[in-house]
Amino acid sequence: MSSQNKITLLLVDDEIDFLQTIAERLLLKNFDVIVASTGREAIEAAEKNLFDVAVVDFQMPGMDGTHVLKALKDRHKYLEIIMLTGHATIDSAVECTKLGAFKYLEKPYDFKKLVEVIKEAYEARLKKKFEHDKKHMEKIQKLSFRESPLGLLRALSHLDDDEK
């Protein structure tokens, strides 16, 4: 992965030692990592930065992981969010899934598995964004054709010239 294609992560956990350890390990794996130790910090970071993937602790004081998940999804449509928890229940996993979580992993986590899931989440984000952009372009093309068929035909002929 080149420096241009680094996955940008938001890492959210109220356990500072855990947060520092996992952030350091992810940095060594060539991820860009921004950390937040509270839900409020996570939301503030998301207002200032565009993240590819977020890894969020489910159980935090103040604002719990489900509130953070919802707030992040409201701000960033294509952000994939992985929930981490030390107290997994079926109900909490279902709730997070309904709110749009990509995956729900239990602590203690397997670091190699976490890295794999982060990469899967990143790929899912790219795919969703690509599909959205593709639909958007198709809509623009349809509108362009309706409004100006000759303009679209000229544009398409230039595309054909570029492929030669």
Where on the chain are the PLM-derived regions?
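Active-site residues of response regulator receiver
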Residues: 13, 57
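Acidic catalytic/metal-coordinating carboxylates
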Residues: 7, 37-41, 64-67
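C-terminal output/effector regions of signal-responsive regulators
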Residues: 123, 133-164
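Short amphipathic alpha-helix used as the core "switch/output" element in two-component signaling
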Residues: 44, 66-78
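Two-component/phosphorelay signaling modules centered on CheY-like receiver
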Residues: 16-34
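Receiver (REC) domain active-site loop signature in two-component systems and cognate sites
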Residues: 60
